Amino acid sequence: DLSIDTITELLHCLDDALLIENGGFEQVKEKMLKEYLGSAYRTPYQAGGVYPSDPSELRGLLSEYCKAIRQEECRVNVNGDLVGILSPHIDYARGQSTYARLWKTARDNLREVELVIVLGTDHYGGPGQITSTFQDYASPLGISPTEISVVQTLANEMGSEFLFKEEFHHIKEHSIELALVWLHYSLEISRLPNIPIVPILCGSFSTF
């Protein structure tokens, strides 16, 4: 049998690790959210882990990924304009060929793009929840400015309480970030300026 002292010690350990949703957890969460909202942009959380934080090293890595893809693998028959890209959000080490083939193919079509609406998987999002943010998204290769007017329109239509209820998730969620690194690289290669974005995290679709 577990003693009261053992249970108490276990609870203290869980509390210290912020694994209990109590006052301490909420205080830390509010502090992190305040720091996030007070920053000039959303800091690239995966830099230095999934991909290099040094711009030159990152460019070299993505360039090597692209060189491994033959040009004939990037030919697709598209009737009309580019309207969307299904980009993976797995780590680059395992998804490199898919990322490279996709973004190398899309590169020539980015010149006409005026706005990128990024729908990223929210691995911790609630059922039916979508979450945007006013923060710009940064990577070592640039900053994607968030189109404030579009996000504000969404907030007006859906309610700010709903749209920003889980904004905290933007801090560490990787799905949008991993796609935007490739967008920044592709724009740089094509000598194009960064394109405004509307970053939206999507929670579980299980309720639909």
What are these regions (language model features)?
Residues 40-208:
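Active-site histidine-anchored catalytic micro-motif
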